[in-house]
A protein has these predicted regions:
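Flexible glycine/acidic-rich beta-alpha junction loops that bind and position SAM and/or redox cofactors
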Residues: 13-14, 66-70, 110, 199, ...
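Hydrophobic/aromatic residues located in beta-strands of well-ordered beta-sheets
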Residues: 4, 36, 98, 146-147, ...
Length: 468
């Protein structure tokens, strides 16, 4: 049986390491016909050269999850690390074809192929396209007819891989395919309940990676996966990693209901809750299922900016959502994205007025300044029209949009002024807690028996520092 080595490139550990769920799902799709091994840079003693030498792969897949941290001020690009730490060593260690994939790759396929001197790549979902690519190479066929396959200077006739049937995908089973120890203490086990997004946010690259239609897994399948993982790992937290958890309406409710029906005792959290779809009944179901916290990503609380960003909810709906989660005592992290098209000081102050009036002071508010420009988005079209970028210019290396009505310096000045008086508001450039703060938080949680979300413990420390 031929061998495939799948290499993860996300080695960031702050604020906590992120497990390579995408690689594990591709591995599951490959395993019936291939001998597969995953290299996880977060594993103890991870040694790429030793793994390549011992495994002697026939093909190597390099997963590229992120391009950068999408932080305008003091942000970090991952391009050089991916190339120097993974792609170049792989080229030196093995003659096996190097194939790129992942969300970060799919946004900039030709740029990454050139940077990494790779042979092929898969744009979009890899569970079907990657095995098809390998089969074509084994048979000596040209793989460029496979949707989503790209090579330096060449692309298939269909840019992205055909969307897979998510209800037929095998479970990722991360803990069976890699050492889960690095993720157990701070991270949460990732669960994906659907793919695709039907929303039209101006800046977002999700639809071009996963498609513009929701493809939902049956609630029973989602909860089967949770139950199986809990049976293997015991007391482990789970995080739903969909772009938005409660879209489309009814899907999140069905999952929560299924968890409750089975009597599972689990700890849950989720990356995104859409204010357009929040009801008291949903939050009650989520609390009953085991949610200890949620995230909400409205991006703005200005009616003008909600329209400019093409959000699918109104200020009134956002206010109602904030009222519902506060009355339900559901800990919530809020995320706002300031500086988009048409942003002014007045619209920024509208967002902070919402924070003051509706957000629980015990909840953390994450403020991002400027918006990362990605190709093939409405924001890209605006950026070209306003001469932020030139048509066809590569955006692999970080470029950010800031409303011309403000400018970068004025935006940073306003946000700095407003966050300085609000201890629960954290700028994106300051959002990763330093190691000493994380250690202090861990000490407090242990000594005081705190069973609150970590962000609330960190806020306790921030308040103490600001008043000291």
């Amino acid at each position: 049986m031929k061998k495939v080595l799948l290499v993860g490139s996300n080695s960031l550990r702050a604020p906590y390491p992120v497990s390579p769920v995408g690689l594990c799902m591709v591995a599951a799709a490959l395993e019936p016909g291939w001998q597969v091994r995953i290299f996880d840079p977060n594993a103890a003693g991870a040694d790429l050269a030793a793994v390549v030498g011992a495994f002697a792969p026939d093909y190597v897949g390099l997963g590229i999850c992120n391009v950068d941290d999408v932080v305008m001020e003091d942000g970090v690009s991952f391009v050089n690390e991916v190339c120097e730490r993974y792609a170049k060593p792989l080229r030196a260690l093995t003659q096996a074809p190097l194939i790129l994939g992942g969300a970060g790759f799919s946004i900039f396929p030709q740029e990454w192929l050139e940077e990494c001197a790779a042979d092929y790549g898969v744009v979009g979902e890899g569970e079907a396209a990657f095995p098809a690519l390998l089969a074509a190479l084994e048979a000596g066929r040209d793989p460029m007819a496979i949707p989503g396959v790209v090579a330096p200077g060449r692309a298939s006739t269909q840019r992205a891989a055909r969307p897979v049937l998510v209800d037929l995908l095998p479970f990722a089973a991360l803990d069976e395919r890699l050492d889960y120890a690095p993720y157990r203490e701070r991270g949460a086990y990732p669960i994906q309940t659907k793919r695709g997004c039907a929303r039209r946010c101006v800046y977002c690259s999700y639809p071009q990676i996963e498609g513009r239609a929701f493809r939902c897994r049956p609630a029973e399948s989602v909860v089967d996966e949770i139950q199986q993982v809990q049976g293997r790992l015991g007391d482990v937290a789970f995080e739903f990693v969909d772009s938005v958890f409660n879209d489309p309406p009814g899907h999140a409710e069905a999952i929560c209901w299924e968890i409750a029906q089975r009597g599972l005792k689990v700890r849950l959290r989720t990356m995104g809750v859409n204010p357009a779809e929040v009801t008291p009944e949903l939050i009650e179901l989520m609390a009953g299922a085991g949610f200890a916290q949620i995230d909400s990503t409205p991006d703005s609380a200005s009616p003008k900016m909600l329209e400019n960003l093409r959000k699918n909810f109104t200020l009134a709906q956002l206010q109602r959502t904030a009222t519902i989660v506060r009355e339900a005592k559901m800990p919530t992290m809020w995320f706002f994205l300031l500086g988009g098209p048409g942003e002014t000081e007045e619209t920024i102050l509208e967002t902070f007025a919402f924070i003051d009036q509706f957000v629980d002071p015990e909840d953390m508010v994450h403020i991002s300044e400027g918006i990362r420009i990605f190709p093939r988005t409405a924001l890209y079209d605006t950026a070209v029209r306003e001469r932020f970028v030139e048509p066809g210019e590569s955006l692999l290396h970080r470029r950010f949009y800031v409303s011309p009505e403000l400018g970068r310096d004025r935006l940073l000045q306003i946000v700095g002024r407003e966050t300085a008086t609000r201890p629960n508001c954290v700028r994106s450039s300051e959002s990763t807690p330093p190691p000493a703060m994380l250690q202090e938080a861990a000490r407090l949680r242990k000594e005081q028996g705190l069973n609150e979300p970590m962000f609330r413990t960190l806020l306790r420390i921030r308040r103490g520092q600001s008043s000291g």
